[in-house]
A protein has these predicted regions:
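C-terminal segment of N-terminal export signals and the immediately downstream linker at the start
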Residues: 31-65
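Internal catalytic or translocation cores that form aromatic/hydrophobic pockets or channels
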Residues: 151-157
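Conserved N-terminal diphosphate/IPP-binding helix and adjacent helical/loop segment
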Residues: 58-73, 80-90
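N-terminal secretory signal peptides
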Residues: 1-12
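N-terminal export leaders
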Residues: 12-34
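An active-site-proximal "capping" alpha-helix that borders the catalytic cofactor pocket
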Residues: 132-147
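His-Asp-centered metal-binding catalytic motifs of divalent-metal-dependent phosphohydrolases/nucleases
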Residues: 109-127, 137, 159-168
Length: 265
């Protein structure tokens, strides 16, 4: 981990926030408007106490209440701080709102579970030294679901949905359960596709699952990944955040890798 003064960290955060946390994924999430649908972390928020009960629906979207859904919610709440838990819940609701309005048929429980577990890779206890956070999260979710007797085929779908959720151009070409996690998380992260959500519906979602501190928390987590396992960000959208704001960031560019290849031309 790189040593930085508190002053430098504060300046870094202000610079990133000032330019928008979505800059690192701007190219990828643009597809939402046109498509079909264990290294220590630099920071680790401590989950605070929260009521166990979820509403039965939000903005007309049913919240699954199966045994597996409740177990996934309990697992996510026990692992992540409220700001991150609220994001994964908004991911599910936004994805469902978009796809329900299109009349798409899908496995609601699977989408819910995949959404609720999709950011486990941003939690220190599930991070490996070398994998992308999406793969760390997909692996952790799959292990959890197999322990809780989800079929191997359905658990594999959840793995794909989580592993591909930042690869919008790929995820939106896959089956709805995979695409919905990408669309919902991208909408909540950068606002792409927000024009599809009426203002009163948006207000209901944000009342149920507030965004309080989400941008700041997301920026902290991106920079933490870039500091603690920079090579895992090779060719990842987050790499530009690290390259721009972390002095001496060691990850090569695509051009660097091409020119360093052991060929004459």
């Amino acid at each position: 981990m790189m040593d930085n003064s508190n002053e430098h960290n504060d300046v870094t955060r202000r610079m990133v926030l000032g330019r928008g946390a979505s800059i690192a994924v701007a190219g990828a999430v643009t597809a939402l408007t046109t498509g079909a649908v264990a290294a220590p972390a630099a920071r680790a928020a401590t989950p605070g106490p929260r009521p166990d009960a979820l509403p039965s629906s939000v903005a007309g979207v049913p919240i699954p209440d199966s045994r597996l859904a409740r177990e996934a919610v309990a697992f996510a709440r026990g692992a992540a701080p409220e700001v991150l838990f609220n994001h994964v819940m908004r991911t599910y609701v936004f994805g469902a709102l978009v796809f329900d309005r299109r009349g798409v048929r899908y496995d609601r429980e699977l989408v819910f579970v995949a959404s609720v577990l999709h950011d486990l890779g941003l939690v220190e206890s599930f991070q490996t030294p070398t994998e992308r956070f999406e793969v760390d999260g997909a692996d952790a979710a799959q292990r959890f679901l197999l322990r809780h007797r989800m079929s191997a085929d359905r658990a594999a779908l959840v793995w794909d949905a989580i592993a591909l959720h930042t690869s919008v151009g790929i995820a939106t070409r896959k089956r709805p359960e995979i695409a919905m996690v990408s669309v919902g998380s991208g909408l909540d992260f950068s606002g792409n596709g927000l024009q599809q959500i009426p203002s009163d519906v948006l207000e209901e979602v944000l009342t149920a699952f507030p965004r309080e501190g989400f941008k700041e928390d997301a920026v902290d987590r991106i920079l933490s990944l870039c500091r603690t396992k920079p090579m895992a960000e090779l060719m990842h959208p987050f790499v530009e955040v690290g390259r721009r704001h972390i002095p001496g960031f060691p990850v090569p560019t695509v051009e660097d890798m091409l020119l360093a290849a052991p060929f004459d031309s």
